[in-house]
C-alpha cells in the first residue's frame, strides 16, 4: 500500500544579517532570514507536514508547537528525524520527496544541487528520489513583493506490512 502526503509552509523574509537563512538544512549566505520559532527552514517544514499527512498524524504544529519554548531556535533537521522515526514506527518507508519553492529570494537555481544533496542526506533517500523546483509568483501578492516564501511538498510512502 502506498500513501501520498502534501505539505505547505510559508515564512516571512526579514532583514536580519545575524540570523541564518536555512533551506533544506543548508545555511545560505544572505543579509535576510526567515522569521520563525525554530530555524524557519521552510523546505523541511513543508516536507515534515507532508510526511505527517501521509501518516495521518496531523502537522508539525501538533508535534512541535511554537508555543513550547523547548522548540525555540530548534534545527528543522530534528523535526525530520522525528518524522522519519514515526514513518518507521508505523511500518512505512519514505519513497520520494518533491518540493516546489515559490519566492524571489534567495534564488534557488544557483544552490539547487546543494539543497537536493542535503535533502537526500536528511531524508536518507537516494539523490534521484528528491527534487526541489522553484518558481516565482510573477510579482503578485506578498510573495511577489519578496515579503516571504512558500514551499509545497509531496511525499510518497510505502507500507512495509505484508
Swiss-Prot record:
The record marks 37, 136 as: Transition state stabilizer. It comes from the Bacteria. It is an enzyme of class 4 (lyase). CDD domains: MECDP_synthase. Signal peptide: none annotated. Keywords: Isoprene biosynthesis, Lyase, Metal-binding. GO terms for biological process: isopentenyl diphosphate biosynthetic process, methylerythritol 4-phosphate pathway; terpenoid biosynthetic process. InterPro entries: MECDP_synthase, MECDP_synthase_CS, MECDP_synthase_sf. A divalent metal cation binds at residues 9, 11, 45. Homotrimer. Belongs to the IspF family. This is 2-C-methyl-D-erythritol 2,4-cyclodiphosphate synthase. It comes from Leptospira biflexa serovar Patoc (strain Patoc 1 / ATCC 23582 / Paris).
Amino acid at each position: 500500500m502506498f500513501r501520498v502526503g502534501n505539505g505547505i509552509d510559508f515564512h516571512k523574509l526579514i532583514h536580519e544579517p545575524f540570523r541564518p537563512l536555512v533551506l533544506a538544512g543548508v545555511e545560505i549566505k544572505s543579509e535576510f532570514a526567515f522569521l520563525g520559532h525554530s530555524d524557519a527552514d521552510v523546505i523541511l517544514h513543508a516536507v515534515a507536514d507532508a510526511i505527517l499527512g501521509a501518516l495521518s498524524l496531523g502537522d508539525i504544529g501538533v508535534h512541535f508547537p511554537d508555543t513550547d519554548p523547548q522548540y525555540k531556535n530548534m534545527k528543522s533537521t530534528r523535526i525530520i528525524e522525528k518524522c522519519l522515526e514515526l514513518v518507521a514506527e508505523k511500518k512505512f518507508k519514505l519513497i520520494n520527496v518533491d518540493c516546489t519553492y515559490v519566492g524571489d529570494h534567495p534564488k534557488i537555481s544557483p544552490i539547487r544541487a546543494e539543497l537536493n544533496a542535503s535533502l537526500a542526506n536528511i531524508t536518507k533517500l537516494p539523490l534521484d528520489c528528491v527534487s526541489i523546483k522553484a518558481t516565482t509568483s510573477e510579482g503578485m501578492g506578498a510573495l511577489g513583493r519578496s515579503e516571504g516564501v512558500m514551499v509545497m511538498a509531496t511525499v510518497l510512502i510505502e507500507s512495509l506490512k505484508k
